[in-house]
């Protein structure tokens, strides 16, 4: 084999040889054409040699590129956000729902000696200071809309009714006592029996721990704040209230244990930029009982009485029969500046009046406290022989064990303020209202932009009560004190022209004016009968006050709709100290609580992205990879084949799973509805049990009464005083009433009413049970449908055929893997076969040898031989042995153009077969060469005989060209 050809095939480089003799130049001069360079044309083209000749890898790369593109498209489609419904146990958005009608909420008290007072033991409910759950500000704002409402709780009313009923039942027995009080009653009446109010699950109490007030619904005509709302910013859920007296009769001051709770009720304004904040007294502080609140509801109207005993807490008629028409503030009184039990400047009041600094005070000389009259300075206390409870007064012997001569100003005291003008956002000060004849026209004394909603833009230069045209239309009454201090602005929509026309129609006022004559401190008109017009009792316009028995009626003025009416209230505020009993004390303290119904969890349907969890796993795996690795195409093909098989086998299973999941979600949702219906049944059953227990307690009380009467009759019979006297005196005591008073169920005190109520509960419970049973049955049916759907789906798709086909999957997989393995082996062995063919195939090359000979002068006829003898002899002497063949094969492997390690490793395996091939080819080539030599000699001799060597300048010979490497 030609080594030069082998080298060119392995390296792609050209290897050619030009053999030229010395006589070539002379031949050119004689016109001979020079010999052309013998340029070698390789058997394999350069274009193919410059690239990979393995077609297998090229086609495989194209195939894998197309599959990768398809997979990326499918992956992009799957990465789109798509949601899937999940039915799960989710938390309620708020966790609770507010209860507006608190009268139907079951409640019990917790205290010591619970059996004695009809309460539960202290451990029955958790301590609210330890067990509570904070509620976020966003949830409280969303539920209550920054409006913490007023609630008239029935629990304090029930307690007051119990004490009231006991007093009436034992009145005759109490009259027989002179110097002692019935055992245990003294503590109850004095409010020393303390406890908590608790509600059972699923109810709870939402306790506000931080709040403030703000104004709403401001009237542009009068400037009044129609509503003052309370914004609770922090709250917590508890089961019980704080510790408070269970009951108490009317009292002036309370225990130190209640100071903190009472101080919390002094609510401050939310806005620090209100005008009242800049005034000396600041803004109003306290709890605002709203307009329209009912202190005693209609269901307990028998407790209202005739006249209100709570001071400023009253309706427009001074009673409690109607809702409140004015806002009432209740706060912990600040008595630090009081002197001898009286407010500041009390000694400067006029003619012994009860009004000072714009406030009309209630009774301060002798305050009622637990049946005693207390002096202002605490130097004396007198027993009145009667106690006040609610709106009633009882003649009851009561001897407390406290020192009534102490200074009561050291203890916490409730102060009630009834605000008539309701302009708390403008000023917290109260004023004395002017009479109508003191209202004049302010000629140049008022400047600025004045209105009922803008007091800061108005200025006055002289004390008085001046009419002024509002910048928004209508009339204003501006009260100016101390020549520059604006204390009040009252307004009306009636303009000056309308008012002046009414004024001129008054009798004797045709030529009168409202100019200030300067009489008195604040001035006034010249003729009192021509004062600012108003409507009298007959709803007719008049300018003169009413005259009776030589006395002139005092006419005052107010803002808004009452600007033209007859007003008798001289002061804008009414205030009193004390005069509250345990019921109202509890009612005020309970306003920091709202009754809620807890619903911690419920069933619901939520939407979650389908690839949510998968995306997180993929992202986590990508982060864990520090280097990108090159994936093998064979592995990807295997993965795609397996995925295709699994997809084909699981396509129908996916359809079945989707349908099954749909029915499952519907079944679970129906089950959730059935659970809610069963919850309603439990609540109705609980209410019915309460009703039954109520009847049992009523029956217990009646049986106890009958037993007491029977006991008394038997006692009379034993004493032999039957029918002889109308009364019987005995030293034997019969203790009765060791039971709880249940008369708060007055509307159901008869058996007929109780049975009607029980029948109503039974009907409601029956309906709820039917609904619950229907919902439960529907849930069971939908749950049973799930396997039926599965069976029907198998029948439609002929699952037996699909599953019988699955048994061929292993054979198919093994066959595919075998084909892939065989193809890979072929692709690896193909270049080895090509290399071996290149190295083992002999290649022949035609070489033209140009030889220039001289003329034979000495001996033409001499025979020097054929010129090949020496060469042939040398050729014959060089035999190809196995060692030479191994050396040549190893040298070829060392000089191979492939430098990559894996290619050189593959070529190393070809050294042994190449050695055998060289040795065999050498042995066969020697035999072939001997045959060619014999034939060449015969031809040479023949040509030499016919033509003659001297006549042939150039001889053409065939020979083997041997490379230096061989």
UniProtKB/Swiss-Prot annotation:
Region (Immunosuppression): 699-715
Subunit structure: The mature envelope protein (Env) consists of a trimer of SU-TM heterodimers attached by noncovalent interactions or by a labile interchain disulfide bond.
Alphabetized UniProt keyword annotations: Cleavage on pair of basic residues, Coiled coil, Disulfide bond, Glycoprotein, Host cell membrane, Host membrane, Host-virus interaction, Membrane, Signal, Transmembrane, Transmembrane helix, Viral attachment to host cell, Viral envelope protein, Virion, Virus entry into host cell
Domain of life: Viruses
Protein name: Envelope glycoprotein
Gene: env
Extracellular domain ranges by topology: 84-801
UniProt site (Cleavage): 632-633
GO biological process: symbiont entry into host cell; virion attachment to host cell
Coiled-coil residues: 665-715, 756-791
Record bears the keyword Glycoprotein: yes
PTM info: Specific enzymatic cleavages in vivo yield mature proteins. Envelope glycoproteins are synthesized as an inactive precursor that is N-glycosylated and processed likely by host cell furin or by a furin-like protease in the Golgi to yield the mature SU and TM proteins. The cleavage site between SU and TM requires the minimal sequence [KR]-X-[KR]-R.
Function: The surface protein (SU) attaches the virus to the host cell by binding to its receptor. This interaction triggers the refolding of the transmembrane protein (TM) and is thought to activate its fusogenic potential by unmasking its fusion peptide. Fusion occurs at the host cell plasma membrane. The transmembrane protein (TM) acts as a class I viral fusion protein. Under the current model, the protein has at least 3 conformational states: pre-fusion native state, pre-hairpin intermediate state, and post-fusion hairpin state. During viral and target cell membrane fusion, the coiled coil regions (heptad repeats) assume a trimer-of-hairpins structure, positioning the fusion peptide in close proximity to the C-terminal region of the ectodomain. The formation of this structure appears to drive apposition and subsequent fusion of viral and target cell membranes.
Segments crossing the lipid bilayer: 802-822
Region (Fusion peptide) location: 633-653
Record topological domains on the Cytoplasmic side: 823-966
């Amino acid at each position: 084999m030609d080594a030069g050809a082998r080298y060119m095939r392995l390296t792609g480089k050209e290897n050619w040889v030009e053999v030229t003799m010395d006589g070539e130049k002379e031949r050119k001069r004689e016109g001979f054409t020079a010999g052309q360079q013998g340029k070698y044309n390789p058997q394999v083209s350069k274009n193919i040699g410059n690239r990979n000749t393995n077609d297998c890898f090229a086609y495989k790369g194209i195939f894998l590129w197309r599959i990768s593109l398809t997979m990326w498209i499918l992956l992009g489609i799957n990465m789109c956000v798509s949601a899937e419904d999940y039915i799960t146990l989710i938390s309620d958005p708020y966790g609770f729902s507010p209860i507006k009608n608190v009268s139907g909420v079951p409640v019990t008290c917790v205290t010591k000696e619970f059996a004695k007072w009809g309460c539960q033991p202290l451990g029955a409910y958790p301590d609210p200071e330890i067990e509570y759950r904070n509620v976020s500000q966003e949830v409280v704002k969303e539920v209550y809309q920054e409006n913490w409402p007023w609630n008239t709780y029935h629990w304090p009313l029930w307690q007051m009714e119990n004490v009231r009923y006991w007093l009436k039942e034992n009145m005759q027995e109490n009259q027989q006592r002179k110097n002692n009080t019935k055992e245990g009653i003294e503590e109850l009446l004095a409010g020393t029996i303390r406890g908590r109010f608790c509600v059972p699950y699923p109810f709870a109490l939402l306790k506000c721990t931080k709040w403030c007030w703000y104004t709403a619904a401001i009237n542009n005509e009068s400037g009044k704040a129609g509503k003052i709302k309370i914004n609770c910013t922090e709250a917590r859920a508890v089961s019980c209230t704080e510790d408070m007296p269970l009951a108490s009769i009317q009292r002036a001051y309370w225990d130190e244990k209640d100071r903190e709770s009472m101080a919390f009720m002094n609510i401050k304004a939310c806005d620090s930029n209100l005008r009242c904040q800049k005034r000396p007294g600041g803004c109003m502080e306290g709890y605002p009982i709203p307009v329209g609140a009912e202190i005693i509801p209609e269901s307990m109207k028998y407790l209202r009485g005739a006249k209100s005993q709570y001071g400023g807490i009253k309706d427009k008629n001074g009673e409690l029969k109607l809702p409140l028409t004015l806002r009432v503030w209740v706060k912990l009184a600040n008595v630090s500046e009081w002197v001898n039990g009286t407010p500041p400047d009390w000694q400067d009041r006029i003619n012994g009046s009860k009004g000072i600094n714009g406030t009309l005070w209630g009774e301060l000389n002798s305050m009622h406290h637990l049946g005693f009259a207390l002096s202002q300075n605490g130097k004396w206390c007198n027993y009145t022989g009667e106690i006040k409870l609610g709106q009633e007064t009882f003649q009851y012997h009561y001897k407390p064990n406290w020192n009534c001569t102490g200074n009561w100003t050291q203890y916490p005291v409730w102060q009630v303020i009834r605000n008539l003008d309701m302009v708390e956002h403008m000023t917290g000060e109260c004023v004395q209202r002017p009479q109508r004849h003191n209202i004049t026209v302010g000629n140049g004394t008022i400047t600025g932009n004045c209105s009922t909603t803008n007091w800061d833009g108005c200025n006055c230069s002289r004390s008085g009560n001046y009419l002024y045209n509002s910048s928004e239309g209508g009339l204003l009454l501006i009260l100016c004190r101390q020549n520059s201090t604006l204390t009040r602005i009252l307004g009306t929509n009636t303009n000056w022209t309308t008012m002046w026309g009414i004024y001129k129609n008054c009798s004797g006022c045709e030529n009168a004016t409202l100019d200030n004559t300067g009489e008195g401190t604040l001035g006034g008109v010249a003729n009192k009968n021509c004062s600012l017009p108003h409507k009298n009792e007959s709803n007719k316009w008049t300018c003169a006050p009413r005259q009776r028995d030589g006395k002139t009626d005092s006419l005052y003025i107010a803002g808004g709709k009452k600007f033209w009416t007859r007003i008798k209230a001289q002061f804008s505020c009414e205030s009193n100290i004390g005069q509250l009993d345990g019921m109202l004390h509890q009612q005020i303290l309970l306003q920091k609580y709202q009754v809620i119904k807890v619903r911690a969890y419920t069933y619901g349907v939520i939407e979650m992205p389908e690839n949510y969890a998968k995306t997180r796993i993929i992202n986590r795996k990508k982060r864990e990879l520090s280097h990108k690795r090159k994936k093998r195409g064979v592995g990807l093909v295997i993965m795609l084949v397996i995925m295709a098989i699994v997809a084909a086998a699981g396509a129908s299973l996916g359809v079945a799973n989707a349908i099954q999941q749909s029915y499952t979600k519907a079944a679970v949702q129906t089950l959730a509805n059935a659970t809610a219906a069963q919850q309603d049944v439990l609540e109705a059953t609980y209410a019915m049990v309460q009703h039954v227990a109520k009847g049992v307690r009523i029956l217990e009380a009646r049986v106890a009464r009958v037993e007491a009467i029977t006991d008394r009759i038997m006692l009379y019979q034993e004493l032999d005083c039957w029918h002889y006297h109308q009364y019987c005196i005995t030293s034997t005591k019969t203790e009765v009433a060791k039971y709880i008073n249940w008369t708060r169920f007055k509307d159901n005190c008869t058996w007929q009413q109780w049975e009607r109520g029980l029948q109503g509960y039974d009907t409601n419970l029956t309906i709820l049970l039917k609904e619950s049973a229907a919902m439960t049955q529907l849930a069971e049916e939908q749950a049973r449908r799930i396997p039926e759907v599965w069976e029907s789906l198998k029948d439609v798709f002929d699952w037996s055929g699909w599953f019988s086909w699955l048994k061929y999957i292993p054979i198919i997989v093994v066959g595919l893997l075998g084909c892939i393995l065989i193809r890979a082996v072929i692709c690896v062995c193909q270049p080895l076969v090509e290399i071996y063919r290149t190295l083992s195939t002999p290649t022949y090359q035609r070489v033209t040898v140009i030889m220039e000979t001289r003329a034979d002068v000495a001996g033409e006829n001499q025979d020097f031989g054929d010129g090949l003898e020496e060469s042939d002899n040398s050729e014959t002497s060089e035999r190809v042995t196995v060692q030479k063949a191994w050396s040549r094969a190893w040298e070829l492997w060392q000089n191979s153009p492939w430098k990559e390690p894996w290619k050189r490793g593959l070529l190393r395996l070809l050294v042994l077969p190449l050695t055998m091939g060289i040795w065999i080819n050498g042995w066969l080539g020697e035999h072939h060469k001997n045959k060619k030599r014999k034939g060449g000699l015969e031809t040479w001799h023949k040509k030499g005989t016919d033509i003659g060597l001297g006549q042939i300048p150039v001889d053409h010979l065939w020979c083997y060209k041997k490379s230096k490497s061989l």
